[in-house]
C-alpha cells in the first residue's frame, strides 16, 4: 500500500514538472513517514506540508523537489542547508551529494533529525545547533546552499559562503514571499525569481 502511495506521489511530481529521475528516486527511497509525528503518518505520502512541532513544518514534497532541482546538484556537491527541521530535506540531499552540512536553531529538532539520519545510515551529513542567519562558515565554501525558512532579505553571511559557480535557493520576504535562485559568478550574483511561496520565517538566534 505504501509503495502505491509513493508511486502516486512521484506521478504527481512528474506532472508538476519534476523530471530529474535521480531526484525522484531519492524521494521514493527516503521514508517520509519516519520524519513526521505518528498522528500524521497516514498523510506521509500526500503532496502537502505537515507540522513537526515547535511551530515548524515539513515542506510538501513538491517544494522539496522544486528547490532541490534548482540547485543543479552533482554527486560531488558540498551543500549547506539552513533549517534542518525534521531532517527530511537533509535526507533527500544526502542521497544526491557528497556531503551535507545542516544548521538548525531549535536544539530539540536538531537532535531528533540527527537521530533519524543516523538510523537511516546517512553518514555524509553533519548537523549543528546554531543561528541559520550565520550559516556554517568553518565548513564552507559550498557548491549549493538551500534555506528552508524565509528571511526578509538574503543574508549576507550566506552569500559569502557560496563558492564561485555555486547556487543558493531560498524563499525571501515577509507577508509576500517568493522563491529565489542566486547564482554566483566570478564577479557578480545573478538573482532569479521563481514563484510565489509560503514558508515559516527564518528567525535569528538559536534556541536551547
Swiss-Prot record:
Keywords: Cytoplasm, Methyltransferase, S-adenosyl-L-methionine, Transferase. GO terms for biological process: methylation; protein modification process; protein repair. GO terms for molecular function: protein-L-isoaspartate (D-aspartate) O-methyltransferase activity. GO terms for cellular component: cytoplasm. The active site is at residue 59. InterPro entries: PCMT (IPR000682), SAM-dependent_MTases_sf (IPR029063). Its EC number is 2.1.1.77. The keyword Transferase applies. It catalyses: [protein]-L-isoaspartate + S-adenosyl-L-methionine = [protein]-L-isoaspartate alpha-methyl ester + S-adenosyl-L-homocysteine. SUPFAM superfamilies: S-adenosyl-L-methionine-dependent methyltransferases. CDD domains: AdoMet_MTases (cd02440). It is found in: Cytoplasm. Belongs to the methyltransferase superfamily. L-isoaspartyl/D-aspartyl protein methyltransferase family. Catalyzes the methyl esterification of L-isoaspartyl residues in peptides and proteins that result from spontaneous decomposition of normal L-aspartyl and L-asparaginyl residues. It plays a role in the repair and/or degradation of damaged proteins. This is Protein-L-isoaspartate O-methyltransferase. It comes from Erwinia tasmaniensis (strain DSM 17950 / CFBP 7177 / CIP 109463 / NCPPB 4357 / Et1/99).
Amino acid at each position: 500500500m505504501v509503495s502505491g502511495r509513493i508511486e502516486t506521489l512521484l506521478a504527481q511530481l512528474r506532472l508538476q514538472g519534476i523530471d530529474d529521475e535521480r531526484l525522484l528516486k531519492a524521494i521514493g527511497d527516503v521514508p517520509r513517514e519516519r520524519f513526521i509525528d505518528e498522528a500524521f503518518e497516514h498523510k506521509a505520502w500526500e503532496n502537502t506540508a505537515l507540522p513537526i512541532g515547535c511551530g515548524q513544518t515539513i515542506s510538501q514534497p513538491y517544494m522539496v523537489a522544486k528547490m532541490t532541482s534548482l540547485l543543479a546538484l552533482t554527486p560531488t556537491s558540498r551543500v549547506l542547508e539552513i533549517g534542518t527541521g525534521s531532517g527530511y530535506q537533509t535526507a533527500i540531499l544526502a542521497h544526491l551529494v557528497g556531503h551535507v552540512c545542516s544548521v538548525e536553531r531549535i536544539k530539540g529538532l536538531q537532535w531528533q533529525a540527527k537521530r533519524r539520519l543516523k538510523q537511516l545510515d546517512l553518514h555524509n551529513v553533519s548537523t549543528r545547533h546554531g543561528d541559520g542567519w550565520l550559516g556554517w562558515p568553518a565548513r564552507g565554501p559550498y557548491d549549493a546552499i538551500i534555506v528552508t525558512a524565509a528571511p526578509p532579505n538574503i543574508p549576507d553571511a550566506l552569500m559569502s559562503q557560496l563558492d564561485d559557480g555555486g547556487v543558493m535557493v531560498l524563499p525571501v520576504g515577509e507577508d509576500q514571499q517568493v522563491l529565489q535562485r542566486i547564482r554566483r559568478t566570478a564577479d557578480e550574483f545573478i538573482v532569479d525569481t521563481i514563484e510565489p511561496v509560503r514558508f515559516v520565517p527564518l528567525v535569528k538566534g538559536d534556541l536551547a
